[in-house]
């Protein structure tokens, strides 16, 4: 019966859920309990995130149309938690492996930085990594999708320096996934073949993009071409395959950046600031927990000086 009710609930036209139609259904069918029934009947067949999206879509409809939302928060949470716990293994994505500095250093051996595409891809890789940014914030989804109000350009790059002389390169992202007003990401000079400053300077020298074009545009035989996410990943996969390395997903760059900064001993709250997280969701991306925590749990006080500096005095 529950399955039949759930099918009936979502077999109606999507504009108005059936339990909100007072002229065609009884009051019983308009009760939020029907939504709980739907979620429970689908638990085990869909991912928890998918069912949560269904749930919140209905709630959004209530908000937009001024209809009272009668669902109790505790009931809603219990239903969604159960659905998430019963999600089939096939609905869960495997954890993405982090890209490491060793991996980037290996890739560098397969790049000819005198070539326009390689110069752009390697600069994009190092900038995305050390700024802990999303790959989509520095690449385009398609060749003709460039919008100067959405995508970063050479004119959006500037430099800042603190009172101690520490210099950082800042990229003003016009708009991001979490902020329509844009956000700033940044990195500092690094020692090694993966230095983002050297890679960016080389890219500017080889490709010489104008100030109002996509930041990592590269010189193609047909003219200046924006770097798309597909082109970026294609070049990374090719280099990885030549080295016999596993092809990593784009989001592995952001995960790898988190891991690298934490392994350097950068405090968790600073890593949150670098990655622009307002909450603790970044903890979901963590890998190698034991290695990260190791310096803080040793029998010898190797982190004592650091702890004294970072911890506030007792009141």
Describe the function of each predicted region:
Residues 1-315:
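Extended, non-catalytic subsegments within catalytic or DNA/protein-binding/adaptor domains
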């Amino acid at each position: 019966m529950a399955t039949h009710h759930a099918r009936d609930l979502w077999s109606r036209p999507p504009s108005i859920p059936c339990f909100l139609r007072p002229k065609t259904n009884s009051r019983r069918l308009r009760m939020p309990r029907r939504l709980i029934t739907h979620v429970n009947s689908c638990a085990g067949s869909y991912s928890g995130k998918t069912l949560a999206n269904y749930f919140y879509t209905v709630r959004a409809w209530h908000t937009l149309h001024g209809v009272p939302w009668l669902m109790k928060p505790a009931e809603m949470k219990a239903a969604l938690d159960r659905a998430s716990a019963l999600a089939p293994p096939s609905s869960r994505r495997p954890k993405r492996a982090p890209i490491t500095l060793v991996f980037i250093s290996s890739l560098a051996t397969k790049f000819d930085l005198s070539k326009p595409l390689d110069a752009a891809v390697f600069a994009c890789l190092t900038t995305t990594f050390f700024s802990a940014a999303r790959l989509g914030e520095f690449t385009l989804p398609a060749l003709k999708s460039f919008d100067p109000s959405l995508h970063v350009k050479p004119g959006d790059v500037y430099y800042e320096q603190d009172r101690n002389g520490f210099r950082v390169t800042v990229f003003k992202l016009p708009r991001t996934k979490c902020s329509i007003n844009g956000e700033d990401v940044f990195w500092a000079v690094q020692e090694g073949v993966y230095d983002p400053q050297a890679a960016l300077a080389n890219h500017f020298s080889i490709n010489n993009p104008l100030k109002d074009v996509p930041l990592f545009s590269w010189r193609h035989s047909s003219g200046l071409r924006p770097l798309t996410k597909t082109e970026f990943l294609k070049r990374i996969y090719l280099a990885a395959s030549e080295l016999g390395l596993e092809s990593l997903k784009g989001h592995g760059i952001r995960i790898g950046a988190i891991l690298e900064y934490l392994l350097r001993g950068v405090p968790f709250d600073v890593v949150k600031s670098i990655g622009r997280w307002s909450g603790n969701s970044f903890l979901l991306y963590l890998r190698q927990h034991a290695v990260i925590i190791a310096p803080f749990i040793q029998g010898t006080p190797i982190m004592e000086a650091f702890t004294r500096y970072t911890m506030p005095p007792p009141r």
